[in-house]
């Protein structure tokens, strides 16, 4: 018995995107990272409340695959939605890149969404792409190779702004001794598109888990990896420990500290991280560290040579994440013309599935949520009705005993 997953449309067409591009998404994002403003220049500025509200609407529309609406709303923000086809992956994959227009001065970061994610609950974040060497490039490598749901990367160096965040915590990162975080440090500022997008996906993707990649200079007393869920609390699903175990499978020489396991460890544990505070339901995301963990935020500090230096290290992290976060919707590669047909496609209401001995049909939306299920007694060519479903793209999962499968 095999499962067959088809992609089909319910009567929807999209007008042209703001931009269409293709190639290798790693190269596309690496070029972006290489050219973002550095540790001075004061290029970064917080969005205002109106811009934050508009941005939230853009994210709502992207998650609902309403790309025309997303493009229309985002235009006023100096951003665009680029439909990017990665031709280095077989089969090719489409990503939607929410990015700054060349003419814009809004350096709020770049946000990448998989059109057809394999791991719908996995969100990757890299807020320090310039200071924490290679974490941005590691993040896009892991995103592409896991086909995670989304990737967030910052828009400037963390020290770019001359203004300080009002949020609690201090750092010596930007010189002049210990001082408050800069506004351009997106891991320590709540008035950002980075924070707003985190809030949206945390709220709207119920099982989403946010992996935030960082880097540090290792002291002799430090391990190679420091992980934290943002609290001292051990969650029901302990992703930090799971990732540790899978990383050890990749490289047994790695050493670790995990903040909720060794409660005396205090260095680089991310308790002032505003995304972690939000995800862990702190009473004040800006100024109060969370006391309990939802288990959905993992802060990973990495020594450079073992994990961040090049694609050899990135592969270790990517493989570990693949192992921990299993596919949320298994899609095998088939020659669909020889397997089955779906008509009409797009459809207004009813759809005919031309296949033999079908005993179950499941339908999923782009969030990986099951919106329809029906069982049969090994029927041929079943008809299902979708008149009650919203417009959009859906995944059709067929289960049957005599469906012809052709693997590429």
What is the meaning of each model-derived region?
Residues 1-19, 331, 395:
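Bacterial Sec-dependent N-terminal signal peptides
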Residues 2, 323-335:
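Phosphate/pyrophosphate-recognition segments in soluble nucleotide-handling domains
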Residues 11, 221-223, 310, 354, ...:
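Hydrophobic alpha-helical membrane-insertion segments
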Residues 17, 141, 209-210, 299, ...:
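Generic detector of isolated residues embedded in canonical secondary-structure elements
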Residues 19-296, 302-327:
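N-terminal catalytic or cofactor-binding beta/alpha core of small enzyme domains
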Residues 332-343, 347-408:
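C-terminal outer-membrane/trafficking sorting elements
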């Amino acid at each position: 018995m095999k499962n067959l997953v088809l992609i089909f449309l319910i009567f929807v067409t999209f007008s042209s995107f703001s931009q269409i591009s293709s190639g290798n998404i790693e190269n596309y994002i690496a070029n972006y990272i290489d050219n973002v403003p550095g540790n001075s220049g004061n290029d970064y500025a917080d969005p205002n409340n109106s811009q934050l509200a508009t941005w939230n609407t853009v994210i709502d529309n992207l998650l609902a695959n309403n790309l025309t609406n997303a493009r229309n709303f985002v235009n006023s923000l100096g951003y665009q939605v680029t439909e990017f086809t990665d031709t280095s992956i077989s089969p090719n994959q489409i990503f939607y890149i929410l990015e700054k227009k060349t003419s814009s001065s809004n350096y709020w970061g770049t946000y990448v969404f998989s059109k057809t994610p394999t791991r719908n609950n996995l969100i990757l974040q890299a807020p320090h792409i310039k200071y924490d060497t290679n974490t941005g490039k590691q993040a896009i490598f892991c995103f592409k190779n896991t086909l995670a749901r989304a990737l967030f990367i910052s828009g400037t160096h963390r020290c770019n702004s001359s203004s300080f965040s009002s949020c609690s915590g201090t750092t010596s990162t930007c010189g002049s001794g210990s001082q408050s975080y800069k506004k351009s440090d997106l891991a320590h500022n709540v008035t950002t598109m980075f924070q707003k997008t985190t809030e949206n996906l945390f709220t709207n993707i119920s099982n989403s888990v946010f992996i935030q990649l960082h880097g540090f200079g290792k002291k002799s007393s430090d391990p190679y990896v420091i992980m934290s869920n943002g609290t001292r609390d051990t969650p029901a699903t302990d992703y930090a420990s799971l990732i540790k175990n899978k990383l050890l499978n990749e490289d047994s020489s790695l050493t670790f500290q995990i903040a909720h396991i060794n409660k005396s460890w205090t260095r680089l544990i991310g308790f002032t991280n505003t995304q972690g505070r939000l995800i862990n339901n702190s009473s004040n995301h800006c100024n109060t560290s969370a006391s309990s963990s939802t288990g959905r935020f993992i802060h990973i500090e990495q020594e450079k040579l073992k994990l961040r230096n090049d694609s050899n290290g990135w592969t270790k992290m990517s493989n570990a994440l693949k192992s921990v976060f299993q596919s949320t919707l298994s899609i095998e590669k088939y020659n669909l013309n020889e397997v089955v047909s779906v008509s009409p496609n797009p459809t207004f209401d009813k759809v005919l599935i031309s296949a033999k001995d079908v005993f179950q049909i499941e339908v999923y939306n782009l969030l990986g949520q099951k919106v329809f299920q029906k069982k049969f007694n090994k029927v041929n060519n079943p008809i299902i009705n979708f008149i009650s479903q919203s417009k959009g793209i859906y995944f059709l999962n067929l289960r049957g005993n005599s469906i012809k499968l052709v693997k590429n």
